[in-house]
Amino acid sequence: ETIRPEAEVVSRDMYIAYRSATSIAEGQTVTLFKYVANLSSMDYAFDKIEAAARDSALAAQAKGFAQLLAEQAAAWAAKWEGCDVSIEGDVAAQQAIRFNIFQMNQTYTGEDERLNIGPKGFTGEKYGGVTYWDTEAYGLPFYLKTAEPHVARQLLVYRYRHLDNAIKNAQKLGFKDGAALYPMVTINGEECHNEWEITFEEIHRNGAMTYAIYNYINHTGDRDYLAEFGLEVLIGVSRFWRQRVQWSDRRKGYVMLGVTGPNEYENNVNNNWYTNLLAQWTLRYAAESIAFVKASHPQRYAEISANGNSIVSAINR
């Protein structure tokens, strides 16, 4: 028997709820079904989102719990089919790896290029759901191995859409000519971090952006991505590295002073090995990518050739 008791709205500061009551006989049970719609103003105008949420919740109610459960189970079964890891002889490890696989797949689906991966996933509140360079270093490889290529591609497109803000971030620190510094912490491409030794010095994050492009193309063979999106990012980051290094007469080579490595054990050090290596590698990879796009996508190359040639000249010197 379905019962629909009257519901009273309970509302106070930062709190809203329904309160309802019903009578049952001894031995009877009541099952409560709650249908909730979670929509974002990223997708709906503010004055329309309430009505859209109501329609969505009512549509879910019309389907009913059993059908919704079946649809959810089928979706997860399809997901697990391509990403499960089976470990024999170690129950704890098996449980742990499947827990993490579940969290990764629940956190990101690749359906919306405006979204990214929060450091604590979908269920953790710490860090407020912002985006770190950890996405490229640790998140992207998981999706490359377990999901369709477009899922990882969307993570790269997310960074491409933030390129203009990365250039503005670099300009605030005195860099010019289209040099790009991707933020340590962000939601929309603007820097959201407030500790100077991290924000200004942990610049290895730029290398994570460029290596992610290489990693994606190496796994998928989608070299068209370079022409469409990737090359512009490589050029912007390469311009940053070109301006960030300085010549040392004593060392007879370029140095990079005042940086913090990814382990954050030491701040404000000179010539962090990881950072220097990624900077050098990025410049070489950018030059190779420019040559590839010039040969394979001449029209696209013509659109960005001025930027590209400036990078080639810098590398040749």
Residue ranges and their predicted role:
Residues 1-127:
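Acidic/polar, glycine-enriched structural segments that form the non-catalytic walls/loops
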Residues 108-123, 149-211, 217, 224-228, ...:
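Helix-terminus loop motifs that line ligand-binding clefts
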